Amino acid sequence: MQRDCVSPTKLENRIKKIVHKPFFKIALFSTTSMTVLGSVVIAPSLPALQSHFQNIAGIDFLSKLVLTLPALFVMLFSPLSGYLLDRYGRIKFLFPAMAIWSLSGFSGFFLDNIYLILVSRAIFGIATAFVMTGATALVGDYYLGEDRQKALGLQGFATAVGSAVFISLGGYLSSIDWRYPFLAYLLGIAIAIFAYTKLFEPHRKKTKKTHKEVEGSNQKFNFLMFLPVYLLVFFCMVAYYISPTQIPFFIVHNLGKNGDIVGISMSASSIAYGVFSLFYNRFRNIWSIYGIYALGLFLMGTCFLLLYVFHNYLIVMVSLMFLGAGGGLLIVNSSSYLLSIAPEMQRAKALGFFASAIFLGQFFSPLMTQPIVDRMSILGLFLIFTCLLYMLGLFFIFKSRMKKNFRKLQS
């Protein structure tokens, strides 16, 4: 009863104090980092997994599907998760999904059938849809304005740091046995327990809605308004996922390195992703949305240009840092823009389709890139994506200048 008597202003001030506490942020951003950990941690074990199941027909494709199949199910179930989270709340779906995420991910440790592993990865993908949409929606609910931009930067940083640590660990474990990286998913249980003690259902203002909120909740979801963001994110993830799906084979087969070296290489990308995500708010204070898109695309394009021209391990490390830096800027920039234009009562739904675009890109990455590798070699793949990313970056420079000229004419 006492809680109901607290005025909205006092309640909002109390919530603001809670969400800025360090342990609260650790719980929230650890939850968001789980979704990226889900894919990258097993990337270094793919060559060894492929060798283990070498007698299975089509194992070249199936081994990559172990990494990317969850993305297909995230794509399919993220819109549904967004609808349910908007309608019934975030927390009641988030914690069960985290438990399922952890157990289904861990099951790959003891399964010795490639098709059962793929089934477990499908279940894992469904759980990931709810975790990713729910956790990102909570970031949008807990923080506003500049605080939200900072929170999204911290989210990207936490995701990248977790990714760097666990992909390095995954690389080391895969050098012992390809099954061992699946043990890392048990960390999700510990994160879920910790998050359960800190996170709470955000205040949704159910009793007294403003006219704008009622209108927003009844308004039909305008998918076309968000479509350009979804398409851009899809393409960026196709390019970004060349790193875990193709570059491990490039390092092992072309450069003759071991699986533990693959993990260290992937972690370089994650560290750069985190650093550039962390400083996103500073980039945003200087450059426009279009300007940051152009910068991110040029950074990613430079990665593939370096890989195409130079063929040594040091250059691979440097190029993957360019890839991570560009990817971090592009994803945080897109999520920040999306949260700024999405109505409050449709936020989770918009983020659900955003998650679908991300994981659809991850799923289609090997489907789109492997035929190019088969026909033109992996170097041909690097050249094609260099050209595509640079051309798209030039397009956003043009858009940015057009917008500036339009503003000058108006003034």
Predicted regions and their residues:
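Helix-loop-helix hairpin linking two adjacent transmembrane segments in secondary transporters
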Residues: 145, 154-200
